[in-house]
Amino acid sequence: MRVLLQRVKEASVTVEEEVVGAINAGYLLLVGVTHEDTEEEVNWLADKVTGLRVFEDDQEKMNLSIQDVSGQILSVSQFTLYGDTMKGRRPAFTKAAKPDMAETLYEKFNERLRANGLIVETGRFGAMMDVALVNDGPVTLMLEKNA
């Protein structure tokens, strides 16, 4: 599982001209699932996102977690995080999980974030989405348990 985390001032996701998820300050998470993932990766990454300290304290040091700043999460499924561009000019997605498995683990990831006390908005799994965001920093991190 890969999570591309972006610290944002605001973010939203629109499907067919309808806003299906929107947040104020917090994280936009682009979440990709591979066929080798289990609930172990799901829980590890959700807990990592919850505890990661990338918000600035009074001394402008990254020392606060999303919980510390009462931030929100917009979680968007993103199978293209597993695009392989080593051969040719078109990415191959053979490392991405099949949709049924990916959706199950993506939902478990979001449930774990909620169980950790976070407000989580989502996109719509498998849909074509327009994602809008205002980066904060910018701070962008790629998280992966077995990188």
UniProtKB/Swiss-Prot annotation:
- Which family is this sequence assigned to? Belongs to the DTD family.
GO molecular function per UniProt: D-tyrosyl-tRNA(Tyr) deacylase activity; Gly-tRNA(Ala) deacylase activity; Ser(Gly)-tRNA(Ala) hydrolase activity; tRNA binding
Bilayer-spanning residue ranges: none
Source species, please?
Exiguobacterium sp. (strain ATCC BAA-1283 / AT1b)
Spell out the subunit comment. Homodimer.
Q: What is the gene called?
A: dtd
Q: What is its EC number?
A: 3.1.1.96
Please tell me whether the keyword Phosphoprotein is annotated for this protein.
no
Q: What does this protein do?
A: An aminoacyl-tRNA editing enzyme that deacylates mischarged D-aminoacyl-tRNAs. Also deacylates mischarged glycyl-tRNA(Ala), protecting cells against glycine mischarging by AlaRS. Acts via tRNA-based rather than protein-based catalysis; rejects L-amino acids rather than detecting D-amino acids in the active site. By recycling D-aminoacyl-tRNA to D-amino acids and free tRNA molecules, this enzyme counteracts the toxicity associated with the formation of D-aminoacyl-tRNA entities in vivo and helps enforce protein L-homochirality.
CC annotations in GO: cytoplasm
Question: NCBIfam families from the xrefs?
Answer: D-aminoacyl-tRNA deacylase (TIGR00256)
GO annotation, biological process: D-amino acid catabolic process
Catalytic activity, as annotated:
glycyl-tRNA(Ala) + H2O = tRNA(Ala) + glycine + H(+); a D-aminoacyl-tRNA + H2O = a tRNA + a D-alpha-amino acid + H(+)
What HAMAP family does the annotation carry?
Answer: Deacylase_Dtd (MF_00518)
Full protein name: D-aminoacyl-tRNA deacylase
Localization, per the record, is: Cytoplasm
Q: Cite the entry's keywords alphabetically.
A: Cytoplasm, Hydrolase, RNA-binding, tRNA-binding
Q: Please, which domain of life does this record's source organism belong to?
A: Bacteria
- Offer one Pfam family short name for this entry: Tyr_Deacylase
- CDD domains referenced in this protein's UniProt entry, alphabetically: Dtyr_deacylase (cd00563)
What is written about domains in the entry's comments? Answer: A Gly-cisPro motif from one monomer fits into the active site of the other monomer to allow specific chiral rejection of L-amino acids.
In chain numbering, motif Gly-cisPro motif, important for rejection of L-amino acids lies across 137-138
Q: Does the keyword Zinc apply?
A: no
